[in-house]
Swiss-Prot record:
Residues 93-143 are annotated as: Disordered. SMART domains: HOX (SM00389). Residues 95-106, 133-143 have a biased composition (Low complexity). Gene3D superfamilies: Homeodomain-like (1.10.10.60). This is Homeobox protein OTX2. It is linked to Microphthalmia, syndromic, 5: Patients manifest unilateral or bilateral microphthalmia/clinical anophthalmia and variable additional features including pituitary dysfunction, coloboma, microcornea, cataract, retinal dystrophy, hypoplasia or agenesis of the optic nerve, agenesis of the corpus callosum, developmental delay, joint laxity, hypotonia, and seizures. Microphthalmia is a disorder of eye formation, ranging from small size of a single eye to complete bilateral absence of ocular tissues (anophthalmia). Transcription factor probably involved in the development of the brain and the sense organs. Can bind to the bicoid/BCD target sequence (BTS): 5'-TCTAATCCC-3'. GO terms for biological process: axon guidance; dopaminergic neuron differentiation; forebrain development; midbrain development; positive regulation of DNA-templated transcription; positive regulation of embryonic development; positive regulation of gastrulation; positive regulation of transcription by RNA polymerase II. It comes from Homo sapiens. It is found in: Nucleus. Disulfide bonds: none annotated.
Length: 289
């Protein structure tokens, strides 16, 4: 009895059973060694089988079950082998495409690196070429503005013999402005341009010089030899006037401008076709044509 109790207690549902007892109860149940994975034999395709598979792959990369079974019957292989072959063939095709793309990028990238400096140089040369003409043209303007004597020489004003050229506006100012530090703003008159064209009062009007105040700032001198041949100037036109911040200096003729008082403001008596001066003490009133 005691020996029976000393035996392993079988009534505990086998939890406390030893391996010997387990082997006695279930001799067939044993834990085998590392289970060996079943390997498939490598399928070797013949040339004829590969030709049939390649022909179908050229038509479609994803054949359905019916097409795979039909090809499997032709080449005498199971359908699963045909499916695996198409799977491997698609992977191989993708790998080849990636290699071609990577190889093409590796070949193109050095070419881009080589051509990029040339493009930068060409772009820099292009931009410098674009900015070169303004710089070259600005040099003559500075030189001409620094020498007002050459601008106002009779030779440069001689082409202005015909002030009455065809023009649409009465008060159109067609002479450019060039800046000099010595004489404020000086007008560089272009040849064969009209001052006030299309009106009868054009022969009496002379260009008005907008003068800025400053130490030694005077009106730019004009050659009297070329001007007096067409315009009769009064002593007031040859005199230089320096006014305040918003003053005007005029080169006028006795037929058009009447200088009343040197200390007072200017009074302009223009032809009725162009300007009408209503009140001397009030502001200017212009009659628009």
């Amino acid at each position: 009895m005691m020996s029976y109790l000393k035996q392993p207690p079988y009534a505990v549902n086998g939890l406390s059973l030893t391996t010997s007892g387990m082997d006695l109860l279930h001799p067939s149940v044993g834990y085998p060694a590392t289970p060996r994975k079943q390997r498939r034999e490598r399928t070797t395709f013949t040339r004829a089988q590969l030709d049939v598979l390649e022909a179908l792959f050229a038509k479609t990369r994803y054949p359905d079950i019916f097409m795979r079974e039909e090809v499997a019957l032709k080449i005498n292989l199971p359908e699963s082998r045909v499916q695996v072959w198409f799977k491997n063939r698609r992977a191989k095709c993708r790998q080849q495409q990636q290699q071609q793309q990577n190889g093409g990028q590796n070949k193109v990238r050095p070419a881009k690196k080589k051509t990029s400096p040339a493009r930068e140089v060409s772009s820099e040369s292009g931009t410098s070429g674009q900015f070169t003409p303004p710089s070259s043209t600005s040099v003559p303007t500075i030189a001409s503005s620094s020498a007002p004597v050459s601008i106002w020489s009779p030779a440069s004003i001689s082409p202005l013999s015909d002030p009455l050229s065809t023009s649409s506006s009465c008060m159109q100012r067609s002479y450019p402005m060039t800046y000099t530090q010595a004489s404020g703003y000086s007008q560089g008159y272009a040849g064969s341009t009209s001052y006030f064209g299309g009106m009868d009062c054009g022969s009496y009007l002379t260009p008005m010089h907008h003068q800025l105040p400053g130490p030694g700032a005077t009106l730019s001198p004009m050659g009297t030899n070329a001007v007096t041949s067409h315009l009769n100037q009064s002593p007031a036109s040859l005199s230089t006037q320096g006014y305040g911040a918003s003053s005007l200096g005029f080169n006028s003729t006795t037929d058009c401008l009447d200088y009343k008082d040197q200390t007072a403001s200017w009074k302009l008596n223009f032809n009725a076709d162009c300007l009408d001066y209503k009140d001397q003490t009030s502001s200017w009133k212009f009659q628009v044509l």
